[in-house]
Amino acid sequence: MINLNVLEAARRTGVKKVVSFLSTCIFPDKVEYPLTADKIHDGEPHPSNFGYAYSKRMLEVQGRAYREQYGLEYVSLIPTNIYGPNDNFNLESSHVVPALIHKCYLAKRDDTDFVVWGSGKPLREFIYSEDVGKITQFVLKTTV
């Protein structure tokens, strides 16, 4: 309901363009790579993200409906794993890029091996936070 209220308030107050940010958790749990926007609704999201993923999926659907019904520029971006300045480098709670940076720093500082966990098989995409800012500015200035 929050997403719909925001879109409707924007429409009623004359906002011509809304850029919404979705999350990669909207993609189906079982999906073939590479991830593309046309795969969003091809299956259930991972159970751990079910409610959040569906609210983000509906934001994309609602934005598309507003474009079609009212001719407004309501678009969605799906940034991948974002990293950059002011990130969380805490090894207990950080995401993968800042955790790897921190582990690398500690290995260098302590003259120990830099160990990366896992099999190396998972595929991940990353994007620098300042690039997300540049992309957002581009989208805001560009007609869809």
Where are each of the predicted segments found?
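Glycine-rich "substrate-gating" loop/helix at the edge of Rossmann-like oxidoreductase active sites
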Residues: 48-52, 80-95, 118-130
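Alpha-helical substrate-binding/gating segment
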Residues: 68, 82, 97-114, 124-144
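Active-site beta-alpha turn of Rossmann-fold NAD(P)-dependent dehydrogenases/reductases
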Residues: 19-23, 78-80, 120
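Short clusters of hydrophobic/aromatic residues that line enzyme substrate/ligand-binding pockets
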Residues: 33-37, 89, 116
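Hydrophobic positions on the long internal alpha-helix
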Residues: 2, 6-10, 62-63, 135, ...
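Active-site Tyr-X1-5-Lys
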Residues: 12, 29, 46-80, 96-110
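Conserved Rossmann-fold NAD(P)-dependent oxidoreductase catalytic core, especially the SDR/UDP-sugar
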Residues: 4-49
